[in-house]
């Protein structure tokens, strides 16, 4: 594909930095040494919690929430700086660090996150995920969602979500007209239809989201994301 200056402009406008952020891949599971102090018994509001001292199979269902800008940059229980754009989570007792698959039981969307913080300590919520994870799970506007969490043991296959249809959110808009215009331009510039992948507009609570998919595997979704990243890289580096 020959990139003219007009095409470069259109590509940059059609596929911005925000879209790359929302289309990022899940956390990469790897064996890590458990944090010494973050896994000690602790007390919050008069209640004592005893974190698990090893990564093992574990499943839990309940409500999830997410935390964002107010906590961005603050230290987590694991001593790292919280990044709302990374795929991380807070849990009251799971080992730090460890990995879990979180599945939204309402829409079947799932994401793998790295547990590096403690919480949530209010209401009946079982896990707090980052803003990026909430976006991928499709509940960033609602604030909470009913989820299933499954501990992933490094070296074992990650649990597979029941709904294998995977979508990548490209960008969100306030009106359907804006979303449709973006979809038309993106389809033209990226030739999405030629790869057998469709673009569509989904109306969510307060926004219209242009998404790419469905994909039947994380690998295929990652390939599509890499292709999109490569296209944007070409846009940014072409002279």
Curated annotation (Swiss-Prot):
One of its GO terms (molecular function) is lytic endotransglycosylase activity. Keywords: Cell wall biogenesis/degradation, Lyase, Signal. Residues 1-25 form the signal peptide. Residues 160-239 form the SPOR domain. Its EC number is 4.2.2.-. It comes from the Bacteria. One of its GO terms (biological process) is peptidoglycan metabolic process. It holds the Pfam family SPOR. Belongs to the RlpA family. PANTHER family: ENDOLYTIC PEPTIDOGLYCAN TRANSGLYCOSYLASE RLPA (PTHR34183:SF1). NCBIfam families: rlpA (TIGR00413). Lytic transglycosylase with a strong preference for naked glycan strands that lack stem peptides. This is Endolytic peptidoglycan transglycosylase RlpA. It comes from Neisseria meningitidis serogroup B (strain ATCC BAA-335 / MC58).
């Amino acid at each position: 594909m020959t990139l003219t200056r007009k095409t470069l402009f259109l590509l940059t406008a059609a596929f911005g930095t925000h879209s790359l952020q929302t289309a990022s891949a899940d956390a990469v599971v790897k064996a890590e040494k458990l944090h010494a102090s973050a896994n000690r018994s602790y007390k919050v509001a008069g209640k004592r919690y005893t974190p698990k001292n090893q990564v093992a199979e574990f499943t839990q269902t309940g409500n999830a929430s997410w935390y964002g800008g107010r906590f961005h940059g603050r230290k987590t229980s694991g001593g790292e700086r919280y990044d709302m754009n990374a795929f991380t989570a807070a849990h009251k007792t799971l080992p730090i660090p460890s990995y879990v698959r979180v599945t939204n039981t309402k829409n079947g969307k799932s994401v793998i996150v790295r547990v590096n913080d403690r919480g949530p300590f209010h209401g009946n919520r079982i896990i707090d995920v980052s803003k990026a994870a909430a976006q991928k799970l499709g509940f960033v506007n609602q604030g909470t969602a009913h989820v299933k969490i499954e501990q992933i043991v490094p070296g074992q296959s990650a649990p597979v979500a029941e709904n294998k249809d995977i979508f990548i959110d490209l960008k969100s808009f306030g009106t359907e007209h804006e979303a449709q215009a973006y979809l038309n331009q993106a389809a033209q510039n990226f030739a999405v239809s030629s790869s057998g992948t469709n673009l569509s507009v989904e109306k969510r609570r307060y926004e219209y989201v242009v998404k790419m998919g469905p994909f039947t595997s994380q690998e295929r979704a990652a390939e599509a994301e890499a292709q999109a990243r490569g296209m944007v890289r070409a846009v940014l580096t072409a002279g």
